[in-house]
C-alpha cells in the first residue's frame, strides 16, 4: 500500500502520444524501474500491465486509459497511460481534464505525427505543463535534432534539450545529461536497471558544450539570476538550472526534452527524474474554480482540510463491481462511508469502497485526499463530468466537452431473448463512454450505435459479444450525417387543447437562422414577461433543442443554427410548461422545413506517408474520393500527403491505398469538421435513406 505522502511530493501525470510512439512500453519500464511491477511487460507479447483488456493485448494498442501509482525518489506518481489512436481521443480528453502534467512521447523517426498534434492541442486547452521524451532512438532513421525541430515548428512549442543522445540507430549507447555534464550508460544485463555514470566522450565534448550553451541561453530569458551569471561568465550550479527550468516549465514557457529507447531499456530513469523535477505537484496548480448553487464563482485549493470537492472523470462497468467511478479529489478528503452531494443531479450519494488502481488490479484505501486520484464504488446517480462535494459547501466544477460521433452501425439482437440484454449492455457502455451514442431510427425502428470511427465501433461490438455475452447482428458502418439551413425563416407554433376540466394553451413565434460551421445550436430569448413568463422559457428552449434532434430533410440532427424566440402568448390559467414545449416544437419544425435545408457530412483530415514514386498514385486515388489535397511535405525519403476528405469516401481506404502503392504507404485520419454535401451527391444519399 502506498503510504501517505506530502502533497508537494505528488505528481498526477498522463503519458500521451501518437499510436506506436511507444507510450505503453515507456510506462511499462517506469513501472519496472520504480518497483511497481517485477517483470517487464511487452506490448508486442500481449502482456503489458497497462494494456489489460483482451482487445488491447490482441491488437497491441491502448484502447482505454489505465491508471496506476508508483514511487520514484520519495515522490508519488499517479500515471494515466492513454490511447494514441484517434478513435479513442475522448479517453485522452477526460484524462487531461484531471491531470497536472504530461509526458509527451515522440517517435525519433516519425517525429510529430497527427495524434501528437491533437494531444498537444488538448493539453494546451487545459494549460498543462509537459516534458517530452523522444523515444525509439535505436530505430533506423532516428533523428533527435529533426524531431526537436518538428516539436518547435509543428506544435509551436519551445522545446529545450536537457540531454543529447550518444549515437543513434544500432549505435545508440546512452544519453549525455546537459545539466550534470555526464553520460549515462544503461546496463543490458540488468535490463537497464543499473545506470553507469561516465565522462562525456571526447568526440561528443564539442556538441555537449554547444547544446549546454543553448540550454542556458533559453533559460536566461526566463530567469534573471541565471541570466546575470551567464552574462558574467560565472559558474552556474546544477541546482540553479533545475530551479530555473522547473519555473519555466510550470509557466508553460519551455518543454524539457529527454531521449532514449524504452524498448531497449535506455533513458527511462532520467525521464522519471524529469517528471519529479519539472512537472507540477497539486500545490503548484492554481486552485480549481467553479460556481456555487447561486452561480457565484468560487475556488478550492488543494488542501485535505478544506471542504471536499472532486470531479468524476470516468465510469467503468466491471465484472467484479457494478460501477467504478474514477475521481480526482481537488480539495478536502473523501472517506469510505461519506455522504456527498452531486449538485448536477441534485442527488446525495453514499461512498462505498475507495480504491487505488493498478491497471485492472485494485487495492482498497480508507480515504482519498486533495490532489490525489482514485476510484469509488457504489455511486448510483453520478456520470462522467459530474462534481461531488459537500451539500453545505456546494461547488460545480467545469465539466468536459465530448465530440459528436461521426459513424454508426445498426445492431439488433439475434433472438427475442437477447433483446433486454442488448439494451442493458448498450446502456452500460454508453454510461462509460460519452463519445458512444445509442439511438433509435424512427422510420425503421432499428437501434443505431454511433462512435468516433470504425475501430471504436469494432471494439464496442467485440465487448458486447464477448464481455457482455450478447448475441447480436451488426450492419455495415454508416456515416453520421447532420442537417443545417441556408436562410432565415420564422414560424408560429400554437398549442390549444382541452384536457379534462381545463384547457392547455401556448403560443410561440420563433425565427431560425443559419450560423457558421461548428457553431452548434444557439437559443436567444427576445421576448418580455408580458408575452411569455420566465417560468416557461426553459420549456421553450427544451422543446426547440429536442425537435432539432431530427431535421426536416431526412431526420438527422440539425446544427449550426440560431433560434430566436421573438413572440408568443399565454393564458393565466391554461398555460403550462408542457404546452410551451409542444408549441416551441411545432414552431421550430415549421421554420426549419422552410429554411432551405442542406445535408452536412463529416470531413476527415488525412495524412498519407508514401514513397516518392507512389505519390502520384496516392493523389490519383484520393481524387476519386472527393478529396482536397492541402499540402505535400518531404519527410526524409518519403512524402507526406495532407488532404481533407469526406468520411463516406474512406470506407475500405486501407485496401485501395495498399493497391495504389503496392503496400508501401500508410495513413492516419481524424475528424476535422462538418461541411455541406454537394447537391448531386446529397440527392443520391437522401434518395437512398428514403428508400426511393
Curated annotation (Swiss-Prot):
UniProt keyword annotations, A-Z: Cytoplasm, Elongation factor, GTP-binding, Nucleotide-binding, Protein biosynthesis
GO terms under biological process: ribosome disassembly
Domain tr-type G: 8-283
GO cellular component: cytoplasm
Record's subcellular location: Cytoplasm
Positions bound to GTP: 17-24, 81-85, 135-138
Any one GO molecular function term: translation elongation factor activity
UniProt keyword annotation of tRNA processing present: no
Keyword Manganese listed: no
InterPro entries noted in UniProt: EF-G-like_DII, EFG_II, EFG_III, EFG_III/V, EFG_V, EFG_V-like, G_TR_CS, P-loop_NTPase
CDD domains xref list: EF-G, EFG_III, EFG_like_IV, EFG_mtEFG_C, EFG_mtEFG_II
Family: Belongs to the TRAFAC class translation factor GTPase superfamily. Classic translation factor GTPase family. EF-G/EF-2 subfamily.
Function, as annotated: Catalyzes the GTP-dependent ribosomal translocation step during translation elongation. During this step, the ribosome changes from the pre-translocational (PRE) to the post-translocational (POST) state as the newly formed A-site-bound peptidyl-tRNA and P-site-bound deacylated tRNA move to the P and E sites, respectively. Catalyzes the coordinated movement of the two tRNA molecules, the mRNA and conformational changes in the ribosome.
Protein name: Elongation factor G 2
